[in-house]
Swiss-Prot record:
Binding-site list for FAD: 41, 49, 54, 94, 129, 294, 335
Organism: Delftia acidovorans (strain DSM 14801 / SPH-1)
Keywords: FAD, Flavoprotein, NADP, Oxidoreductase
UniProt-listed InterPro entries: FAD/NAD-bd_sf, FAD/NAD-binding_dom, Fd--NADP_Rdtase_type_2, Ferredoxin-NADP_redctase_2
Complex and partners: Homodimer.
MF-aspect GO terms: ferredoxin-NADP+ reductase activity; flavin adenine dinucleotide binding; NADP binding
Gene3D superfamilies documented for this protein: FAD/NAD(P)-binding domain
Family affiliation: Belongs to the ferredoxin--NADP reductase type 2 family.
Cofactor or coenzyme needed: FAD
Official protein name in the record: Ferredoxin--NADP reductase
Catalytic activity line of the entry: 2 reduced [2Fe-2S]-[ferredoxin] + NADP(+) + H(+) = 2 oxidized [2Fe-2S]-[ferredoxin] + NADPH
Disulfide bridges in this chain: none
EC numbers for this chain: 1.18.1.2
Organism taxonomic ancestry: Bacteria, Pseudomonadati, Pseudomonadota, Betaproteobacteria, Burkholderiales
Keyword NADP on entry: yes
Length: 350
């Protein structure tokens, strides 16, 4: 899967909203039907809730896989969908979705991307995962490029003083990465106890012992800026005393939370914050829009990953009929030469 962006409207047969396990398998099933697609997700990486909340936890109910972690399942799905060459647009949400005069759907993202899609597949799970914001005075005074939420790249701290705020695995990993780039690195958290893997905690301790990372125990109370440039972070210790720490970059890793967001504003039939679908097709009440996974509701619905895989299959067959005007021929990946060609399966000459 490729991460792409552009300024011209993108024309596509299918738009998949959400890159969790259900969304990834939707890409695979659409690919088997010969339908190319683009994928949009709010997170900076694929995997959705599975990777974000259960990345290192065991999963036991995936058919044919006795046990795997969330990260391992996502990696397997990425390998499986690779032949479909889906175009990926990360760290952005679909903010608007409206019907065009020709029957297609116009989708706009929070990064200004515009897509014209013949069909749309909503696999948004429990909602888009967005970082928990730092809510202290002074945040609004900062110019762009100094306050970073869960950044995928930390090159911007090179040669500067960086403060990483948080106590989970992402915060620890970010502090370790900053130590290799920043002039000085501080890890600021409300207590001296961090939730991370043993390997990361061991590395953190090594860097603390060497002075490459300095741990500050407290809570941020205010940010100070000069002409939009971060100057210092004000923090309060356990005894209520206020202190200032000079810094040019602030990395915030306070976790993420799901928000239903714009989905509720698209005019689709909903019940208790879930989209109503026909379980035979996963179709919503809008022509060409399908929904799968935890975001949907129908009689007998179960919020399980494997149910999302089934729903993705039903949606792909229904969409193929909708887009092509006839019911698709059922073919099997074990024997179909057409499907083998799509999957890149080669057959040695006898």
């Amino acid at each position: 899967m490729q991460d792409t962006s552009g300024t011209q409207p993108i024309q596509t047969d299918a738009l998949v909203i959400g890159a969790g396990p259900a969304g990834l398998f939707q890409v695979f099933q659409l690919g088997l039907q010969g339908i190319r697609c683009h994928v949009v997700d709010a997170l900076p990486h694929v995997g959705g809730q599975c990777a974000q909340l259960y990345g290192d936890k065991p999963i036991y109910d995936i058919p044919g896989i006795p046990v795997c972690t969330g990260h391992e399942l996502v990696q397997l799905l990425q390998r499986q969908v690779a032949p479909m060459d889906a175009q990926l647009h990360l760290s952005q949400q679909v903010s608007q979705l409206q019907r065009m005069d020709d029957g297609r759907w116009l989708a706009q993202t929070t990064h200004g991307l515009e897509l014209h899609a013949r069909s749309v597949f909503i696999a948004a799970g429990v909602g888009a995962f967005v970082p928990k914001a730092l809510k202290v005075p002074g945040v609004e005074l900062l110019a762009a490029g100094q306050l970073h939420y869960h950044p995928a790249d930390l090159e911007m701290v090179r040669g500067q003083t960086a403060i990483v705020h948080g106590g989970d695995e992402e915060a620890v990993a970010a502090a370790i990465a900053c130590a290799d780039r920043a002039q000085a690195t501080y890890l600021l958290y409300r207590r001296d106890a961090f939730q991370a893997s043993a390997v990361l905690l061991e590395r953190l301790q090594e860097l603390r012992d060497s002075g490459a990372i300095r741990v500050v125990i407290g809570q941020i109370t205010q940010l100070h800026a000069d002409a939009g440039q971060l100057r210092a972070v004000q923090w309060m210790d356990g005894e209520g005393q206020e202190h200032e720490l000079a810094a040019q970059q602030l990395v915030v890793c306070l976790g993420i939370s799901p928000r239903l967001g714009p989905v509720a504003e698209w005019g689709l039939a909903m019940e208790r914050k879930q989209l109503l679908v026909n379980p035979a097709t996963q179709a919503t009440d809008a022509p060409g829009i399908y929904a799968i996974g935890d975001i949907v509701s129908y009689p007998g619905k179960h919020k399980l990953i494997l149910c999302g895989f089934h729903e993705a299959t039903m949606a792909a067959f229904a969409a193929a009929e909708y887009l092509q005007g006839e019911k698709p021929l059922l073919q099997y990946t074990t024997t179909s030469a057409r499907l083998h060609a799509i999957l890149g399966v080669s057959h040695p000459q006898a």
